[in-house]
C-alpha cells in the first residue's frame, strides 16, 4: 500500500483588513510568485472573498510540451523528491540538479486520437494533476494558484500553416504556484485566516517561523503605495483601419461557412510602472466577480474580469460555464455620471438587438456542447439565460450553463476539453482559433486564457483573463476583442474593443498622472 505523503497544515486567525492591496503591499510586494484573488458581488459591488498566496513552495511552469518544477525553498524540495517518480513514468525527465529543479518533456498529443483518448493521454496538465493528486488525502486541501495562457491551446489543436510573429512579449503556457502560506478572507464576516502548508517533516520549525513573521507583519499594514509619474500615451498593434480590415476579411470566412461567429482582438499598450496602485484603482472603479493580481518573476498580470472560465465543485461534481456575449456602453451623461434613463434605454437596446441575441445564443450553444463533452448524459442544462450584468463602463448579456462531470474525469480534463472559452474564440471553436492566429499573427499570451486555482480535493475556479493588463518591462498590454457575426459593422466592432479596454486603460492613466 502506498504511503500517504507527509503534510502538516496549521491554521490561525489573523487581523482582518478590508484593503487587500495594502496587505499584498506589506507581505508580497517584494515576493515574486505571489497571487491575490479578490471577488465582489455583481449587483451590490460589495467585496465577498479574497485569497492571498503570500509565498510558494514550488513553481510549476509550462512552455510547449515541457513542464518545469522548481523548488523555491527546502519545503518545496521535499515535494519535488516525492513527485519525481510519478512524473518520470509520464514523460522524459531532465535536470541539472534534481533537488532544486527538473523538467518533464511530454510527448506531443496525437490529433488523430478521439476525444476520450486525448483526455486519457499523458499531457502537460499532468504537471498540475500529479501534485494535486499527491496531496488528495490532506484534510486541508493544498492550493495551486496561477495562470493558463490562451496559447496553451496550441499544444492541443492542429497548427499547420500558422506562423506567428515575435511581438517581444514572453508568457509561459501556464504558470502555477503551490502555496506555502495562504490567507483566506471573508469580507462579509470580516474574518481572516492564515494557512501554512509544510510538506517536509524537517521544515516544520522553519515554516512555523515564517507564519509567525507573517502574522506579526499583519499588525502593521502599509497601505501607502509608491507612485511614479509616467506617460499616459496609448499605442495599439492595430489602428482602426487595419482592425476593421481584419473584421471585413473574417466576414468572408463567415460567409463561406468556416465559422458562424469569431472574436478578433487587438492590443492597447501604455507605460505602467505602478502596477499594484493601478490594480487598486481598477478595483475601486470597476469591482467585479473575479479580480486578480499575479506577481510572477517574468510578468505582472492584473485585472477585473466579469466572466468565469470554468468552475467545478467536487461535492456535487457540478461543472459550470458562464458565457458573456453582447454588450453596450453604460449610459453616461455629459458630466461622466450614469444617467439611469439612458442606461435603461441602452439595456433595452441590447436585449432587443437581433445581432447581439444571435451572437449570445451561438455561444450558449457552444458552452452546452463543451459541457456535454465531459459531463454525464442528461445532466446538462442552461441554468440562467440572457441576464444583464453591469460594470463601470459596459453592460453585458450573460447566461450560465451547468452539467455533472463524468466520474472518471477531473477539472483539468474539463479545462483541456473546453479551452479556450467560446466567448473569446468563436464557433466552431477550433476553426475560429486557427483563423484568429492566422489574422492576428501573434500569440495572445494571457489574454483569453484563465487565472484562478485548483485544490487537492478537486475544486477548480477560474475566470477568463479579460479586462486585464499583462505588464512586462514596465509596459502594460491590454487586449480586447469583439464578437463578430455575419451582419457585424466593422467600425462598431472596433469601437467595442475600445469600450472593453476602457476601464483598465483609465485606471492605469489615473495613477500615471497622479504623481505628476
Q: Whereabouts are the PLM-identified features?
A:
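Extended alpha-helical targeting/anchoring segments
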Residues: 1-516
Amino acid at each position: 500500500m502506498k504511503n500517504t505523503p507527509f503534510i502538516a497544515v496549521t491554521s490561525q486567525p489573523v487581523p482582518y483588513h478590508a484593503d487587500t492591496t495594502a496587505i499584498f503591499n506589506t507581505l508580497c510586494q517584494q515576493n515574486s510568485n505571489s497571487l491575490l484573488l479578490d471577488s465582489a458581488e455583481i449587483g451590490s459591488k460589495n467585496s465577498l472573498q479574497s485569497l492571498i498566496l503570500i509565498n510558494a513552495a514550488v513553481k510549476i511552469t509550462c512552455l510547449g510540451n515541457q513542464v518545469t518544477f522548481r523548488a523555491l525553498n527546502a519545503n518545496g524540495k521535499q515535494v519535488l523528491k516525492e513527485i519525481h517518480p510519478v512524473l518520470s513514468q509520464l514523460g522524459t525527465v531532465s535536470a541539472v540538479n534534481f533537488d532544486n529543479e527538473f523538467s518533464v518533456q511530454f510527448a506531443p498529443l496525437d490529433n488523430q486520437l478521439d476525444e476520450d483518448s486525448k483526455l486519457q493521454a499523458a499531457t502537460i496538465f499532468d504537471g498540475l494533476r500529479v501534485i494535486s493528486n499527491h496531496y488528495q488525502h490532506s484534510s486541508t486541501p493544498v492550493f495551486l494558484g496561477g495562470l493558463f495562457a490562451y496559447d496553451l491551446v496550441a499544444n492541443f489543436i492542429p497548427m499547420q500553416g500558422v506562423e506567428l510573429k515575435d511581438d517581444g512579449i514572453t508568457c509561459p503556457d501556464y504558470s502555477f504556484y503551490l502555496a506555502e502560506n495562504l490567507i483566506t478572507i471573508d469580507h462579509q464576516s470580516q474574518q481572516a485566516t492564515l494557512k501554512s502548508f509544510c510538506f517536509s517533516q524537517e521544515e516544520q520549525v522553519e515554516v512555523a517561523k515564517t507564519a509567525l513573521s507573517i502574522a506579526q507583519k499583519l499588525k502593521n499594514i502599509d497601505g501607502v503605495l509608491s507612485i511614479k509619474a509616467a506617460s499616459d500615451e496609448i499605442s495599439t498593434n492595430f489602428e482602426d483601419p487595419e482592425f476593421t480590415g481584419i473584421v471585413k476579411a473574417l466576414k468572408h470566412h463567415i460567409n463561406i461557412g468556416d465559422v458562424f461567429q469569431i472574436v478578433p482582438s487587438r492590443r492597447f499598450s501604455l507605460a505602467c510602472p505602478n502596477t499594484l496602485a493601478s490594480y487598486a484603482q481598477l478595483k475601486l472603479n470597476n469591482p467585479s466577480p473575479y479580480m486578480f493580481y499575479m506577481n510572477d518573476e517574468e510578468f505582472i498580470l492584473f485585472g477585473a474580469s466579469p466572466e468565469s472560465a470554468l468552475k467545478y465543485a467536487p461535492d456535487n461534481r457540478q461543472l459550470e460555464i458562464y458565457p458573456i456575449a453582447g454588450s453596450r456602453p453604460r449610459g453616461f451623461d455629459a458630466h461622466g455620471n450614469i444617467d439611469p434613463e439612458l442606461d435603461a434605454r441602452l439595456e433595452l437596446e441590447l436585449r432587443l438587438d437581433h445581432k447581439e441575441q444571435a451572437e449570445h445564443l451561438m455561444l450558449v450553444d457552444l458552452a452546452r456542447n463543451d459541457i456535454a463533452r465531459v459531463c454525464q448524459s442528461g445532466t446538462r442544462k442552461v441554468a440562467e439565460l440572457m441576464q444583464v450584468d453591469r460594470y463601470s463602463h459596459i453592460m453585458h448579456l450573460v447566461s450560465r450553463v451547468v452539467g455533472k462531470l463524468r466520474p472518471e474525469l477531473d477539472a483539468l480534463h474539463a479545462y483541456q476539453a473546453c479551452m479556450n472559452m467560446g466567448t473569446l474564440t468563436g464557433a466552431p471553436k477550433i476553426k475560429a482559433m486557427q483563423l484568429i492566429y492566422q489574422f492576428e499573427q501573434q500569440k495572445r499570451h494571457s489574454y483569453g486564457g484563465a487565472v484562478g486555482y485548483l485544490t487537492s480535493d478537486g475544486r477548480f475556479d477560474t475566470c477568463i483573463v479579460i479586462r486585464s493588463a499583462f505588464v512586462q518591462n514596465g509596459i502594460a498590454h491590454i487586449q480586447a476583442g469583439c464578437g463578430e457575426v455575419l451582419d457585424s459593422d466593422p467600425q462598431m466592432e472596433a469601437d467595442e474593443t475600445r469600450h472593453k479596454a476602457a476601464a483598465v486603460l483609465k485606471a492605469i492613466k489615473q495613477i500615471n498622472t497622479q504623481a505628476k
